[in-house]
Amino acid sequence: MISRLFGKNKAGFCENSRLISFRYSPGYSDMRGAMHSEELTRNENGGWITVCRDRDSHAEPVVVTVYSVSDAAAEDFTSFLRKSGAASLADRRKDDLFATDYSPWEYEMEFDPPRSGSGRRYIRICEYRKYSKRDYALIRELNSRFRAIRGEKISETVEPD
């Protein structure tokens, strides 16, 4: 499905597009409803922020924590996405290992292409693919760089049920 949306050159697409958001979810192996996600996105003033959503179980509310991200850190991360070829990881073949009671880890990149009217594009890198050792090294670096951009805590709220 990803190839149909983007064609075969996802890395080239990323180089010529503007990053809208980047999302990470570590995945879970229990059925209690625990979840965590982090998203690099822009706030209503156009500044970069990281929004983290956490819940321990279905019975608990979601805690939303917002962190600042400097423009320099966001630009450095975006540059890494473009130059590293991370988007090409979405092209890896599907893995035969699949568990229906498990939420896989995933990264999702949202881009706005340079041509107006062509719509936003999403690139998804997920656990159920066949990755090489080199791919896993890139995924570890991607994760490390993403975690490093988070700045000071701006706010923390609890979402109502």
What are these model-predicted stretches?
Residues V51-A90:
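A short-motif feature that recognizes glycine-rich, charge-decorated loops
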Residues I2-M31, T65, F80-D161:
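Short, well-ordered, aromatic-rich surface patches in folded extracellular/luminal domains
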